[in-house]
């Protein structure tokens, strides 16, 4: 599949405007195709991100740190691949290092890399956890995503406040309930 040109993308926006009954040549919509293409370039910039490269800078002097590292409430906005409507939420990531750690900003960067794509929350949860597991090789990883989906609030069942939670565990988090319990207790929204 070849990537359409910028002009072809702008023409597609004009077509959608006509589809909903709008006139793409009216004053307020003249620059809309260009704005939408610019927005999509930013919103979907995760396709160009290499997660392995993001997690490449590791620190090995951890002073024998053996408990888990938790970064909570990483905010994100993504777009569901089914309706192309936003879902907005937070990600909590914990890992128990084996022999290395990464700077905490790297965890937020991988959330951005995966959220700035067409997504489903379940897949994004697994992608984040498995990428940390694969690249850092920790004893285990836990990821929890909580999100509001506008495909449920703007259309269909019209549920404004329904929050979807997904979790994925690897290693010791998957094997031992105590670690899952501690993670869920620390990430519970109060």
Curated annotation (Swiss-Prot):
<comment type="similarity">
    <text>Belongs to the GTP cyclohydrolase I family.</text>
</comment>
<keyword id="KW-0862">Zinc</keyword>
<dbReference type="GO" id="GO:0005525">
    <property type="term" value="F:GTP binding"/>
</dbReference>
<keyword id="KW-0554">One-carbon metabolism</keyword>
<dbReference type="InterPro" id="IPR043134">
    <property type="entry name" value="GTP-CH-I_N"/>
</dbReference>
<dbReference type="GO" id="GO:0008270">
    <property type="term" value="F:zinc ion binding"/>
</dbReference>
<dbReference type="Pfam" id="PF01227">
    <property type="entry name" value="GTP_cyclohydroI"/>
</dbReference>
<dbReference type="InterPro" id="IPR001474">
    <property type="entry name" value="GTP_CycHdrlase_I"/>
</dbReference>
<comment type="subunit">
    <text>Toroid-shaped homodecamer, composed of two pentamers of five dimers.</text>
</comment>
<feature type="binding site">
    <location>
        <position position="151"/>
    </location>
    <ligand>
        <name>Zn(2+)</name>
    </ligand>
</feature>
<dbReference type="GO" id="GO:0003934">
    <property type="term" value="F:GTP cyclohydrolase I activity"/>
</dbReference>
<dbReference type="GO" id="GO:0005737">
    <property type="term" value="C:cytoplasm"/>
</dbReference>
<keyword id="KW-0378">Hydrolase</keyword>
<protein>
    <recommendedName>
        <fullName>GTP cyclohydrolase 1</fullName>
        <ecNumber>3.5.4.16</ecNumber>
    </recommendedName>
</protein>
<comment type="pathway">
    <text>Cofactor biosynthesis; 7,8-dihydroneopterin triphosphate biosynthesis; 7,8-dihydroneopterin triphosphate from GTP: step 1/1.</text>
</comment>
<dbReference type="GO" id="GO:0006729">
    <property type="term" value="P:tetrahydrobiopterin biosynthetic process"/>
</dbReference>
<keyword id="KW-0479">Metal-binding</keyword>
<dbReference type="GO" id="GO:0006730">
    <property type="term" value="P:one-carbon metabolic process"/>
</dbReference>
<feature type="binding site">
    <location>
        <position position="83"/>
    </location>
    <ligand>
        <name>Zn(2+)</name>
    </ligand>
</feature>
<dbReference type="InterPro" id="IPR018234">
    <property type="entry name" value="GTP_CycHdrlase_I_CS"/>
</dbReference>
<feature type="binding site">
    <location>
        <position position="80"/>
    </location>
    <ligand>
        <name>Zn(2+)</name>
    </ligand>
</feature>
<dbReference type="GO" id="GO:0046654">
    <property type="term" value="P:tetrahydrofolate biosynthetic process"/>
</dbReference>
<keyword id="KW-0547">Nucleotide-binding</keyword>
<dbReference type="InterPro" id="IPR043133">
    <property type="entry name" value="GTP-CH-I_C/QueF"/>
</dbReference>
<keyword id="KW-0342">GTP-binding</keyword>
<dbReference type="InterPro" id="IPR020602">
    <property type="entry name" value="GTP_CycHdrlase_I_dom"/>
</dbReference>
């Amino acid at each position: 599949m070849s990537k359409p040109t910028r002009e072809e993308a702008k023409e597609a926006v004009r077509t959608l405007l006509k589809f909903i009954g709008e006139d793409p040549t009216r004053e307020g919509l003249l620059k809309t195709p260009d704005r939408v293409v610019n927005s999509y370039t930013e919103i979907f910039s995760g396709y160009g991100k290499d997660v392995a490269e993001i997690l490449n800078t590791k620190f090995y002097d951890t002073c024998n740190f053996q408990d888990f590292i938790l970064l909570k409430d990483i905010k994100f906005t993504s777009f569901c691949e089914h309706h192309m409507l936003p879902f907005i939420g937070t990600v909590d990531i914990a890992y128990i290092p084996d022999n290395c750690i990464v700077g905490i900003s790297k965890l937020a960067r991988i959330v951005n890399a995966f959220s700035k794509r067409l997504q489903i929350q379940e897949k994004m949860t697994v992608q984040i956890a498995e990428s940390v597991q694969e690249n850092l090789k920790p004893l285990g990883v836990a990821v929890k995503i909580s999100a509001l989906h506008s495909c449920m609030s703007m259309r269909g069942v019209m549920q404004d406040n329904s929050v979807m939670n997904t979790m994925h565990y690897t290693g010791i988090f998957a094997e031992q309930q105590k670690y899952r319990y501690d993670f869920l207790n620390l990430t519970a929204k109060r």
